[in-house]
UniProtKB/Swiss-Prot annotation:
This is UDP-glucosyltransferase 29. Keywords: Glycosyltransferase, Isoprene biosynthesis, Transferase. The gene is UGT29. Belongs to the UDP-glycosyltransferase family. Its EC number is 2.4.1.365. It comes from the Eukaryota. One of its GO terms (molecular function) is UDP-glycosyltransferase activity. InterPro entries: UDP_glucos_trans (IPR002213), UDP_glycos_trans_CS (IPR035595). Gene3D superfamilies: Glycogen Phosphorylase B (3.40.50.2000). It comes from Panax ginseng. One of its GO terms (biological process) is response to molecule of fungal origin. Component of the dammarane-type triterpene saponins (e.g. PPD-type ginsenosides or panaxosides) biosynthetic pathway. Glycosyltransferase that catalyzes the conversion of ginsenoside Rh2 to ginsenoside Rg3. Triggers the biosynthesis of ginsenoside Rd from ginsenoside F2. CDD domains: GT1_Gtf-like. The keyword Glycosyltransferase applies.
Length: 442
């Protein structure tokens, strides 16, 4: 800690998923803007995706090299585009990087470490170097509180049964892998120094933040949605094409369709989404992720020709924040990853929830509970069907029945704008106090 000006240095270690790298990077930018020296540590492949977006001299990108193998070469040291069967090997490789990270911490000697739910060794290694560590929770308080409640109060009813009713659920013994993940998750809360940072805001899930604070016996400090500035860097040709297309559409008449950076739709799912968009008659931009080697014959034959200029299909990555922040965008067909929900709320765009797995169904339910989204209902076989997709798109974007949802999304966005960056300011105050307390103990 710089004694002359109170400037602190902070190291950040996110998990290797884009949905974690992105909020950690946005947090790093906010801390750097407030006169902190920041070190963001991750694998070279993850850092390469943000190098061009880093304009602050106060953020240093620090490479963490994982052990490589023929099955897990360096370009797979990220969950972005990672084949599902390599997810566990990647986690295992990350778990073995503790000694390497220990050397990095020894060299950097930061005043504080901000860590993620994985790897499990981060707070212990920080402690071995006499560095305080704070957990940064990048998922919703609502979904996180369910797991922590079940662990702390087994057999007891969850306090908000309208959101999650566990009264008729008989828990099954978790597998060894899931048990380890659960214990690692609990340890993240227990090892955090005094507070827990959370990517959230009270206007969306205040009661769940309070519940999680009680369950963890730690002060939860929201840092807001941490959405990247959509105008923060130069536009590439693809972005330019998309924005030009949006500029020609009327206000709030376009749905953006995106299912995240890690999930590939099956051919059947692609067809249902495509026909759903077609019969909805609503304008759309669809970011389609295609598995390498399977690029032909996936979208229904003639689909692109039939929708014509009403739809824009973009292969691979799309500038999500730029699209959601555009005045023509009036709905977001989303997999309901927490970062996507936060971005949608930041820009006042209602969510059409097509959740996939993990915490996503709960995130979609939360958006619906608050009144800023609507869930697409699965059929009796657990599948999304074209008619249901089209119906919810039209309700949310076009029909009079969706006006309440559209208004609530706008109102929530306005509240967040009025609040500005108060959450980050308070979070930094808490972090400085932790560093001062540690220094006084030495």
């Amino acid at each position: 800690m710089d004694n002359q000006n109170g400037r602190i240095s902070i190291a950040l270690l996110p998990f290797l998923a884009h949905g974690h790298i992105s909020p950690f990077f946005e947090l790093a930018k906010q801390l750097a803007k407030r006169n902190c020296n920041v070190f963001l540590c991750s694998t070279p492949i993850n850092l390469s995706s943000i190098k061009d977006k880093d304009s602050s001299a106060s953020i240093k990108l620090v490479e963490l090299h994982l052990p490589s193998s023929p099955d897990l070469p360096p370009h797979y040291h990220t969950t972005n585009g990672l084949p599902s069967h390599l997810m566990l090997p990647l986690r295992n490789a990350f778990e073995t990087a503790g000694p390497t990270f220990s050397e990095i911490l020894k060299t950097l000697n930061p005043d504080l470490l901000i860590y993620d739910f994985n790897p499990s060794w981060a707070p212990e290694i920080a402690s071995s170097h006499n560095i305080p560590a704070v957990y940064f929770l990048t998922t919703a308080a609502a979904s996180s509180s369910i797991g922590l409640h079940a662990f702390k109060n087994p057999g007891e009813k969850y306090p908000f049964p309208d959101f999650y009713d566990n009264s008729n659920i008989t828990p099954e013994p978790p597998s060894a892998d899931n048990m380890k993940l659960l214990h690692d998750f609990i340890a993240c809360f227990e090892r955090s120094c005094d507070i827990i940072l959370i990517k959230s805001f009270r206007e969306l899930e205040g009661k769940y933040i309070d519940l999680l604070s009680t369950l963890s016996d730690k002060t939860l400090v929201p840092v807001g949605p941490l959405v990247q500035d959509p105008m923060g860097h130069n536009e590439d040709p693809k972005t330019e094409q998309i924005i030009n297309w949006l500029d020609k559409r009327a206000e709030s008449t376009v749905v953006f369709v995106c299912f995240g950076s890690e999930y590939f739709l099956s051919n059947e799912e692609l067809e249902e989404v495509a026909i759903g968009l077609e019969i909805s008659t609503v304008n759309f931009i669809w970011a389609v992720r295609l598995i390498e080697g399977e690029k032909k014959g996936i979208l229904p034959e003639g689909f692109v020709q039939r929708v014509g200029d009403r739809g824009l299909v973009v292969e691979g990555w799309a500038p999500q924040a730029r699209i959601l922040g555009h005045s023509s965008t009036g709905g977001f067909v989303s997999h309901c990853g927490w970062s996507s929900i936060a971005e949608s709320m930041k820009f006042g765009v209602p969510v059409i929830a097509m959740a996939r797995h993990l915490d996503q169904p709960l995130n979609g339910k939360l958006a619906a509970e608050v009144g800023v989204g609507m869930e697409v209902v699965r059929d009796e076989n657990g599948k999304y069907k074209r008619e249901g997709i089209a119906e919810v798109i039209r309700k949310v974007v076009v029909e009079k029945s969706g006006e309440v949802i559209r208004r609530k999304a706008r109102e929530l966005s306005e509240k967040m704008k009025e609040k500005g960056e108060q959450e980050i300011d308070r979070a930094l105050e808490e972090l400085v106090q932790i560093c001062k307390k540690k220094k006084d103990e030495q």
